[in-house]
């Protein structure tokens, strides 16, 4: 099957311009983005692409090589699709920065900080392992993102859930936060 809308986009602004024109009429697009810690060069970064997609009610989905180049697919977000805590925080930041559009706002879930509750099984496991007190000393954003990410697997993949939970407990007991939970600092002070 030939993929549609393989875009030759080099910058965040070019992607935003494409989304402004096509977000209501197209079903998908593919772009080449670089992963990793963004720098101030002219590289089109994955995080930038995700942020622009969120502004228009779109979301990243699968990656695959097309003509020998690894491409990222973006699609309109499906109604009632789950929102990760990371994407919720990105949306809060984009709203505050004035980048969010009405199309993006229409698909937002409840956004209050109190709309998130740590999964009771994740909380119980942290408490049983004597890691809960340490976990509660970490930033609230970290707590929400890590607890959500572990709970995400609970109904989808029991083995992955157990591995993610064990890793969270192990790192928490060491007093270590892990992973890119704040988009390389973008989500800390905005």
Model-derived regions, located:
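Charge-dense, helix-prone N-terminal extensions
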Residues: 1-190
């Amino acid at each position: 099957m030939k993929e549609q809308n393989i875009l030759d986009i080099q910058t965040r602004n070019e992607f935003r311009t494409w989304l402004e024109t096509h977000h209501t009429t197209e079903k998908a697009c593919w772009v080449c983005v670089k992963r990793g810690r963004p720098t101030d060069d002219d590289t089109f970064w994955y995080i930038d692409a995700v942020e622009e997609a969120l502004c228009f009610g779109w979301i990243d989905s699968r990656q695959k090589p097309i003509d020998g180049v690894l491409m990222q697919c973006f699609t309109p977000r499906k109604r009632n699709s789950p929102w990760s805590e990371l994407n919720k925080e990105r949306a809060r930041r984009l709203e505050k920065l004035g980048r969010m559009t009405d199309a993006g706002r229409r698909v937002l879930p409840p956004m209050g900080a109190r709309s998130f509750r740590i999964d009771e099984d994740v909380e119980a496991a942290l408490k049983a392992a004597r890691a809960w007190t340490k976990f509660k000393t970490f930033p609230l954003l970290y707590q929400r993102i890590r607890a959500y990410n572990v709970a995400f697997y609970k109904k989808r993949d029991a083995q992955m859930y157990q591995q993610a939970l064990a890793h969270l407990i192990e790192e928490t007991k060491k007093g270590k936060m892990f992973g890119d939970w704040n988009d390389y600092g973008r989500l800390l002070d905005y």
